[in-house]
């Protein structure tokens, strides 16, 4: 992969066309930027909001059917690995080299990581405590408090995780369509890597966002504790599944915990479910995985697949119970 500087006086579009004309076999596009999908407002108030994960029946602790997940990959911002909820987790954080600008903040990455693998005895018990999580910090701080990841760094991050034989990657980020990203997503799918992507928080009437809108990803939207769609979630025919994403209890960046809202925090529920499903069959294709996970959804919208909830709301209780039944009994 090559990153080029645009000559002075030439537009980005002209530069892209010129490079593409030099080699018609190359995939050429702009170095777009992508952002995490969290909302500063919790979107939840009152007693019981922190227990929003219970609407999908996610078991507490190491439930038998969900106790042996496959290794998980995460591409996100920096992570506070010293947070009490992550202190004893099987977490590895990789920082990309040769990155420009200031380091990204730890708020988003820490929250997503803790939601996935936070210690079961902490204030932020993860969905899969004890699971191995390999996280790549692909973001940099831009414009004050905004964290962004370039296509160049996203591709490098996905390559790194592929080298580590990760079979499911959480992508709680969105941005514009990009030919290089699309090619990378297709290559990952061809390698048997399942990409779980946040649907986006740009609003119900927004245009599709990526990578969620690509066919080779699982696009996850968010719902609140009443199973209502998150008010800012992007809608579209590419939405695959819904999960809790409003008032989700997870780690704060430095210490303690707080409620978080956004499709960023719905995606980890599905990532965790995928990790469990592929633990017995790491070579499961995306097509087979999607057919399998549909068996563990509750249709809460229009009959069948719809642009608001996809196939429906993840039912973690039935997923874990199924996994428990599939395991051979002890002698």
Model-derived regions, located:
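Substrate-binding/access-modulating region of protease and related hydrolase catalytic domains
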Residues: 138-215, 228-229, 235, 253-267, ...
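Protease zymogen maturation seam
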Residues: 10-85, 308, 330
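Catalytic-core environment of secreted peptidases
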Residues: 75, 81-84, 91-93, 222-264, ...
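Loop/turn elements at helix/coil->beta-strand transitions in domains of secreted/extracellular proteins
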Residues: 24-26, 68-71, 130-133, 163-169, ...
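Hydrolase catalytic cores
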Residues: 115-116, 136-138, 167, 245-326
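Aromatic/histidine-rich interaction motifs
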Residues: 1-12
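Subtilisin-like serine protease catalytic core
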Residues: 59-72, 78-92, 100-150, 214-216, ...
């Amino acid at each position: 992969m090559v990153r080029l500087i645009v000559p002075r006086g030439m537009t980005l579009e002209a530069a892209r066309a010129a490079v593409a004309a030099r080699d018609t076999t190359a995939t050429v596009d702009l170095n777009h930027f992508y952002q995490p999908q969290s909302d500063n407002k919790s979107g939840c108030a009152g007693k019981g909001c922190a227990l929003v994960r219970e609407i999908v029946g996610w078991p507490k602790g190491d439930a038998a059917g969900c106790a042996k997940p496959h290794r998980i990959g995460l591409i996100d911002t920096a992570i506070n690995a010293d947070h009490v909820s992550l202190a004893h987790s099987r977490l590895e954080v990789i920082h990309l080299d040769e990155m420009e600008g200031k380091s990204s903040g730890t708020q988003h990455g820490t929250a997503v990581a803790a939601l996935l693998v936070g210690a079961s005895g902490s204030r932020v018990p993860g969905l899969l405590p004890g699971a191995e999580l390999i996280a790549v910090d692909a973001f940099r701080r831009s414009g004050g408090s905004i964290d962004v990841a370039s296509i160049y760094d996203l591709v490098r991050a996905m390559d790194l995780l592929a080298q580590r034989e990760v079979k499911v990657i959480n992508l709680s980020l969105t941005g514009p369509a990009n030919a290089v990203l699309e090619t990378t997503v297709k290559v990952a799918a061809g390698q048997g890597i399942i990409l779980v992507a946040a649907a986006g928080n740009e609003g119900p009437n927004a245009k599709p966002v990526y990578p969620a809108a690509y066919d080779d990803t699982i696009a996850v939207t968010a719902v609140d504790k009443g199973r209502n769609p998150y008010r800012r979630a992007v809608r579209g025919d590419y939405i695959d599944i819904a999960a809790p994403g409003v008032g989700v209890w997870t780690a704060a960046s430095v210490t303690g915990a707080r409620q978080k809202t956004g499709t960023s925090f719905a995606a980890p529920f599905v990532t965790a479910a995928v990790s469990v499903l592929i633990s017995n069959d790491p070579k499961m294709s995306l097509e087979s995985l999607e057919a399998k996970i549909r068996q563990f959804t509750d249709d809460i919208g229009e009959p069948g697949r719809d642009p608001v909830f996809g196939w429906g709301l993840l039912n973690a209780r039935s997923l874990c119970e199924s996994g428990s039944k599939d395991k051979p009994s002890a002698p």
